């Protein structure tokens, strides 16, 4: 099998060399070219026809977001973004994922030559996944900012919780969540818990961005807080999200528990952990959604959801950036509905 062709785009000659050496060390990938800015990258893409691009965001001449937008308009080539861990960097990364980037890797800080090598395994794994995704990836957003929703009132702390939606996603998930969460109407009588595989810092930016676009209140989950209807709680990076029920008078209440117990399958947060916890602790109706992502996180916990008479939705392969997690879910034989991304919110509402 021929090696997958990779184009490296970064304005730092040092970074281009480091990334190139890492990629060329793998026998399934090869560097076919390097570019120092976005304009040069577009020219190299036309000339070299790479299978996948790894690209920095902050570059001269033509920045990464503008370059990515043009790539998506022309051929939807799979792109992996190198992102900084700064606040600006996390926000730019989320915009890149909305524009159509397949995934991202957080640029390490500190002693750069040693730290860059620490991401080698992650880089190679994600490049291989990206190189094998469809080139006809759907593009849902443009560089223009989406409409920001009006400020929401504070949630009613005494409102009874009778329904729960749990969502799991990985690669392609941030973009998919931007299509699902803002479509929920204000005042729904369910809370939504989300596990999206992302590093620390990125989940907070994701929650803030979704909150600005949604009628529901969206936030990064905090340890010990009460789970309320019409609110969305996103598991913070590097923490497992669990549910804990408590009896208050004659009524049950649900609370968030966060911990840094052992990663499951290398993942923290892990959907399996959240789903099993919810199935054990929640006393009423559960709807579970497994969306785009590599691997099989979530599938092992589906029998627990079914034991509680929960309903399960999997995203259809046609709209997945990576058909891994939904495929594993479908293969359990426990999924009730398989629907494209555009129909997930409507399907969830019909099951509540």
UniProtKB/Swiss-Prot annotation:
The keyword Cytoplasm applies. Coiled coil: none annotated. Its main location: cytoplasm. SMART domains: REC (SM00448). GO terms for biological process: chemotaxis. One of its GO terms (cellular component) is cytoplasm. Its EC number is 3.1.1.61, 3.5.1.44. Phosphorylated by CheA. Phosphorylation of the N-terminal regulatory domain activates the methylesterase activity. It is found in: Cytoplasm. The active site is at residues 170, 197, 297. It catalyses: [protein]-L-glutamate 5-O-methyl ester + H2O = L-glutamyl-[protein] + methanol + H(+); L-glutaminyl-[protein] + H2O = L-glutamyl-[protein] + NH4(+). Residues 5-122 form the Response regulatory domain. The modification 4-aspartylphosphate is found at residue 56. GO terms for molecular function: phosphorelay response regulator activity; protein-glutamate methylesterase activity; protein-glutamine glutaminase activity. Pfam families: CheB_methylest, Response_reg. It comes from the Bacteria. Involved in chemotaxis. Part of a chemotaxis signal transduction system that modulates chemotaxis in response to various stimuli. Catalyzes the demethylation of specific methylglutamate residues introduced into the chemoreceptors (methyl-accepting chemotaxis proteins or MCP) by CheR. Also mediates the irreversible deamidation of specific glutamine residues to glutamic acid. Belongs to the CheB family. NCBIfam families: PRK00742.1. Contains a C-terminal catalytic domain, and an N-terminal region which modulates catalytic activity. This is Protein-glutamate methylesterase/protein-glutamine glutaminase 1. The gene is cheB1.
């Amino acid at each position: 099998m021929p090696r997958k062709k990779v184009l490296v785009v970064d304005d730092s000659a040092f970074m281009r060399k480091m990334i190139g050496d890492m990629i060329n060390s793998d026998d399934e990938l090869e560097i076919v070219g390097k570019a120092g800015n976005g304009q040069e990258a577009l020219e190299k893409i036309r000339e070299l026809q790479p299978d996948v691009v790894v690209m920095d965001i902050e570059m001269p001449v033509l920045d990464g977001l503008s370059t990515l937008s043009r790539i998506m308009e022309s051929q939807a080539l799979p792109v992996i973004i190198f992102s900084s861990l700064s606040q600006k960097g996390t926000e730019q990364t989320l915009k890149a994922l909305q524009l159509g980037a397949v995934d991202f890797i957080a640029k390490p800080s500190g002693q750069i030559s040693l730290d860059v090598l620490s991401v080698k395994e992650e880089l190679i794994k994600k490049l291989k996944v990206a190189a094998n995704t469809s080139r006809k990836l759907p593009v849902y957003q443009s560089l223009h900012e989406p409409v920001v929703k009006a400020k929401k009132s504070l949630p009613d702390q005494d409102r009874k919780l009778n329904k729960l939606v749990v969502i799991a996603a990985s690669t392609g998930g941030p973009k998919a969540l931007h299509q699902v969460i803002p479509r929920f109407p204000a005042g729904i009588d369910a809370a939504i818990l989300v596990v999206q595989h992302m590093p620390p810092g990125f989940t907070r930016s994701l929650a803030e961005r979704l909150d600005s676009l949604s009628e529901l209140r969206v936030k990064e989950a905090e340890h010990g807080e009460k789970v309320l209807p019409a609110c969305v709680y996103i598991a913070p990076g590097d923490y497992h999200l669990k549910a804990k029920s408590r009896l208050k008078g004659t009524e049950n209440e649900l609370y968030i528990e966060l911990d840094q117990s052992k990663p499951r399958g290398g993942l923290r947060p892990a959907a399996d952990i959240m789903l099993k916890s919810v199935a054990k602790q929640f006393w009423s109706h559960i709807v579970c959604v497994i969306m785009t992502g590599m691997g099989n996180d979530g599938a092992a916990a589906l029998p627990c959801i079914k034991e509680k008479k929960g309903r399960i939705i999997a995203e259809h392969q046609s709209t997945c950036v990576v058909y891994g997690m939904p495929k594993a879910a479908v293969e359990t034989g426990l999924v009730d509905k398989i629907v494209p991304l555009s129909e997930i919110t409507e399907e969830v509402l019909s099951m509540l």
